[in-house]
């Protein structure tokens, strides 16, 4: 930029360097069966105009329309940076959907593929430090510093940006909510080994209906739920997580079959565990390549890109993921 200074005694200031974008997501017009229920700005043209306006005013983001015109790619400095824009837009009344964040790679002078790395710091009670170190190791991180106090330990790591995605939730889990985790961009370095994504399969709604307590009571025995009684669900929407790696299509609206004879347990209310809720950041970190986050002024939902189970199966067969 320009420097304004005294012409008689000019002082030249060093230019301010802006960290390069490290992650990108694609914004698309919502294709949800519930589109238009919460927001009044749902069109693809309106979404494009809003993001192009953001490009004019926000120099820290790189915003480009995809060649096939199916969406707008927005690149920023991490998931928090991107989620701030999404939060602003949902408050303005926009409804849209975004895909899984992808890491932006670079090529070094010798042709080596480079990826963004981050410096991460975790502060946690001493008894959880071992679990934190193990969690970072599984995510491709390396511990570079450690300070142990009487009750708290501060751990410093170097970790690829790919490994950071989803790490905040895991750190909170292993520290029982007592860990403090923050990270910042460090450098571009050679790509390390491939990292695995989410290991748990999803429960996927088979129809567009409101969730029923009886059905949820049965499903919570098979995993954790993302919805509660009365919540609107639709075919292809993620409604829970199961401990096994494969997905399972479920009926969230199944009701109890009533017989002629009264059972001694017929009137016992279903005891449900409160559903697991997600922030925008957590949802973006959670989804896989074949999933999307639906963003509205009132809701954050996760869904399959292909809503129909039949379409998902056809796609899997075409790509050799399952046998015919």
Could you say what each language-model-derived stretch is?
Residues 1-324:
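Accessory interaction regions appended to the cores of large information-processing enzymes
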């Amino acid at each position: 930029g320009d420097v304004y200074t005294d012409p008689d005694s000019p002082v030249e200031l060093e230019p301010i360097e802006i960290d390069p974008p490290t992650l990108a997501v694609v914004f698309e017009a919502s294709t949800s069966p519930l589109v238009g229920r919460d927001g009044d700005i749902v069109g693809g043209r309106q979404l494009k105009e809003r993001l192009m306006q953001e490009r004019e005013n926000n120099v820290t983001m790189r915003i480009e329309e995809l060649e096939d015109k199916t969406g707008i790619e927005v690149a920023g400095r991490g998931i928090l940076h991107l989620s701030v824009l999404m939060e602003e837009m949902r408050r303005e009344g926009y409804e849209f959907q975004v895909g899984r964040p992808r890491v932006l790679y670079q090529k070094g002078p010798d042709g080596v593929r480079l990826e963004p790395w981050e410096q991460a710091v975790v502060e946690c009670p001493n008894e959880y430090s071992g679990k934190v170190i193990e969690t970072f190791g599984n995510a491709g991180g390396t511990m570079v510093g450690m300070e142990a106090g009487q009750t708290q330990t501060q751990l410093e790591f170097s970790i690829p940006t790919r490994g950071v995605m989803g790490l905040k939730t895991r750190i909170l889990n292993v520290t029982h909510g007592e860990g403090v985790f923050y990270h910042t961009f460090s450098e571009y370095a050679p790509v390390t080994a491939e990292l695995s994504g989410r290991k748990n399969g999803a429960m996927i709604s088979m129809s567009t209906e409101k969730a029923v307590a009886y059905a949820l009571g049965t499903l919570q025995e098979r995993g954790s739920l993302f919805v509660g009684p009365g919540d609107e669900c639709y075919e292809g929407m993620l409604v829970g997580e199961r401990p096994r790696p494969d997905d399972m299509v479920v009926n969230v609206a199944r009701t109890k079959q009533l017989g002629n004879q009264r059972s001694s347990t017929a009137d016992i209310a279903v005891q449900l565990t409160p559903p697991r809720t997600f922030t925008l950041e957590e949802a973006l970190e959670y989804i896989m390549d074949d999933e999307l986050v639906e963003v509205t002024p009132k809701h954050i939902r996760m869904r399959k890109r292909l809503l129909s189970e039949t379409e998902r199966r056809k796609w899997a067969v075409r790509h050799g993921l399952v046998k015919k």
